[in-house]
Swiss-Prot record:
It comes from Arabidopsis thaliana (Mouse-ear cress). This is Probable LRR receptor-like serine/threonine-protein kinase At5g10290. The chain crosses the membrane at residues 226-246. Residues 247-613 are cytoplasmic. The modification Phosphothreonine is found at T287, T313, T390, T450, T451, T456, T467, T547. It comes from the Eukaryota. SMART domains: LRR_TYP, S_TKc. Residues 1-31 form the signal peptide. Its EC number is 2.7.11.1. The keyword Thylakoid does not apply. Residues 290-569 form the Protein kinase domain. Residues 32-225 are extracellular. The modification Phosphoserine is found at S371, S466, S471. It is a single-pass type I membrane protein.
Amino acid sequence: MRMFSLQKMAMAFTLLFFACLCSFVSPDAQGDALFALRISLRALPNQLSDWNQNQVNPCTWSQVICDDKNFVTSLTLSDMNFSGTLSSRVGILENLKTLTLKGNGITGEIPEDFGNLTSLTSLDLEDNQLTGRIPSTIGNLKKLQFLTLSRNKLNGTIPESLTGLPNLLNLLLDSNSLSGQIPQSLFEIPKYNFTSNNLNCGGRQPHPCVSAVAHSGDSSKPKTGIIAGVVAGVTVVLFGILLFLFCKDRHKGYRRDVFVDVAGEVDRRIAFGQLKRFAWRELQLATDNFSEKNVLGQGGFGKVYKGVLPDNTKVAVKRLTDFESPGGDAAFQREVEMISVAVHRNLLRLIGFCTTQTERLLVYPFMQNLSLAHRLREIKAGDPVLDWETRKRIALGAARGFEYLHEHCNPKIIHRDVKAANVLLDEDFEAVVGDFGLAKLVDVRRTNVTTQVRGTMGHIAPEYLSTGKSSERTDVFGYGIMLLELVTGQRAIDFSRLEEEDDVLLLDHVKKLEREKRLGAIVDKNLDGEYIKEEVEMMIQVALLCTQGSPEDRPVMSEVVRMLEGEGLAERWEEWQNVEVTRRHEFERLQRRFDWGEDSMHNQDAIELSGGR
């Protein structure tokens, strides 16, 4: 008896094991099914050309969307002029939620295997040349909400199984050759259309062949009333939600997973799993095997490469080379999480990422005009120079980006390497703050943290350099130096100035010229005098307020934004001048006591602790 029980247990285990195997859909099987569909549809060589049969994971293919577990959830192949048939192998995609193949010339019948797509919520095969009967297996799709089979050549009766779809909201079967009686319960669906068939909409309880919602007649007044009512209702609901969230945040503060964007921005909360997962091979091909000719820069965690995806989208691929070292992998996870929730028009958006056993990569949009540093100092002869209006817009855009990081993210985000090289420029020369590799999430209860000093000499705030303590005021200092770069076109630290004067640091250089009222010697010669003197003076004043020695004296970024917009600068500048006179007298007194000399600095190079971006 005991032996018999063991045999039954073994058999049950074996059956369970094989059942699990059968229910598991591997990326290989998904890719094979999709590629079989491509063949059956008779796709041309230039259509779906990135669908590679040898690629394990189809989640990188065009028109395919996957979830965070690499299961295919959406396939959209609309208006591509296919002339083939549907493949029954699509039926293995049991996680597929949306299947759209409308507007093609697909022939043949709808496969019975489509009834295996049990996760499907939307099936759209409108405007094709499909023939045969509607499969009764469609009734297995209990989650189906939208079924659109309009404008085909389907015949036969409407299967009774469609009455067993509890979530169906839209049923559009018009313009076919269907015949017979329409099941009574289908008239209870909110939106239906059975017109242009040989169907019987009468019977014992006559019904219109099209629902009021689906009717396309000229009753514009009722439609207008409905639309107005819906819009008004939605407006009231949205206002109530916003009011609720505002009151909730006033009492409880920000939650970790919620951020408040500035006016005019769309709240786009992006979960980690919703970022695009790139295949290693895809990025390898995009960057020409990470060719040195495609290197855009090198940072503290690796190089950045220019890449081109199969759809000709240009990207910047950041390849992390030290993720196995302490902090490397954690830095990757921190950056992915941080960038994905910090969404603002003046912040660099993360497109996606790639992880393998040996690689960690981040993918960003490619900025057409590269960086502010490049446009200021590395343009070729004949290239357009940044005019003054563009420079003002860049200054304000970058300030708004840093304001968002400091004051609208919870916890706040400290960049810690603010400089012109990390302010990127899009196709419209709008400022886009990039490189969060050095960014640090700071607990709201702390104003600073002691950590390893990272940054670029000439941009690092004095308290950060001497103590390792950083805060948002550290970024404000770096931003002030960046403003001086924007005005002068010069580097933050330049030893060539030793030939003429002692001021190696751009900050000291500008302070000296400002005291001497030599504005023309400060402004970038490339502007060729095309600027407004008062506006340049205002920008220099903001820069000097941002670079005060004591972090407590520096404005926060929201104040910087207001000052750049013309509010509150005069009062702050007057206070600064009074303090600066006292500091200058003290400095001159100390200078008379000590011989500073030049030899200790003359042969040094600029030190970039984090590397170029």
